Amino acid sequence: MRHTLPIAPQFYVTAPQPCPYLDGRMERKLFTALQGESADKLNDSLSQQGFRRSQNVLYRPSCAECSACLSARIDVSEFAPSRSQKRTIKRNHDLARRATSPWASEEQYELFRSYLDSRHADGGMADMDVFEFAAMIEETPIRSRVVEYKNQDSGALIGVSLTDVLSDGLSMVYSFYAPDMTKRSMGTYMILDHIEIAREAGLPYVYLGYWVPGSQKMGYKSKFSGLEVYIGGNWQKVRNPSEFTAETHPLSTDPIAEQVANIQLPDTRPTR
């Protein structure tokens, strides 16, 4: 029987642009397309190596002179809520969670716009229209869910997370919430709830995206016990977040060719 081996993913690098997290720095990303029958395997493999998904693209920071962005995940078995996090859970007891297929709605887009206008008005997604929003939610070649959080009494949509289901955990691709309900700490609450979802499903990790030491926008991620970051090809436990800094070093980043050569691709050869 004749078999055709799949084409190996091709990796590319974006042009440098201003970093959205650290002033005065430039960011650059290494990326590849996510498509075909082996998309799930590729997404699983590269997610475990610090990559993130955006629609049908997988990317990882590959800045020329900076390695401050650290891919972060929570080891569910090592997590225990702090007193503050327990209070956050209690404050949101009136919310109902609903996980659905990745379909966008006008209600979601209205919440998304409110969130962006309040929190990220100068960000790269600030001009996203309803069609681009729908593409962000719906264009997924892998198993994804939209997790909605609504007030049980009023039915108002309070928070949304676009979540990928990996072989070893949940990946919170993008989350947004009502910006005027600061006392709810919805960003933290949705992570706490995803930890519980993963625990119930027997999945060991919750992938959070990137933690950037020195960035106030990302500081909340370091407050979760069981946190791990991807450094030098390995996941390392974060015992003391203050030990991690955003300082640059001339030897802190490997050349692009070396980074690509060290990426472990899944075995996608046909088994039949």
From Swiss-Prot:
Enzyme class: transferase
InterPro entries named among the record's database cross-references: Acyl_CoA_acyltransferase, Asp_Glu_LeuTrfase, N-end_Aminoacyl_Trfase, N-end_Aminoacyl_Trfase_C, N-end_Aminoacyl_Trfase_N
Keyword set, alphabetical order: Acyltransferase, Cytoplasm, Transferase
Localization in the cell: Cytoplasm
Keyword Acyltransferase: yes
EC number(s) given by UniProt: 2.3.2.29
Disulfide bonds: none
Catalysed reactions, as listed in the record: N-terminal L-glutamyl-[protein] + L-leucyl-tRNA(Leu) = N-terminal L-leucyl-L-glutamyl-[protein] + tRNA(Leu) + H(+); N-terminal L-aspartyl-[protein] + L-leucyl-tRNA(Leu) = N-terminal L-leucyl-L-aspartyl-[protein] + tRNA(Leu) + H(+)
GO molecular function annotations of the record: arginyl-tRNA--protein transferase activity; leucyl-tRNA--protein transferase activity
Gene Ontology terms: biological process: ubiquitin-dependent protein catabolic process via the N-end rule pathway
GO cellular component, one term: cytoplasm
Main subcellular location: cytoplasm
Role according to the record: Functions in the N-end rule pathway of protein degradation where it conjugates Leu from its aminoacyl-tRNA to the N-termini of proteins containing an N-terminal aspartate or glutamate.
NCBIfam families listed in its UniProt record: PRK01305.1-1 (NF002341), PRK01305.1-3 (NF002342), PRK01305.1-4 (NF002343), PRK01305.2-3 (NF002346)
UniProt similarity note: Belongs to the R-transferase family. Bpt subfamily.
Protein name as catalogued: Aspartate/glutamate leucyltransferase
Gene from which the chain derives: bpt
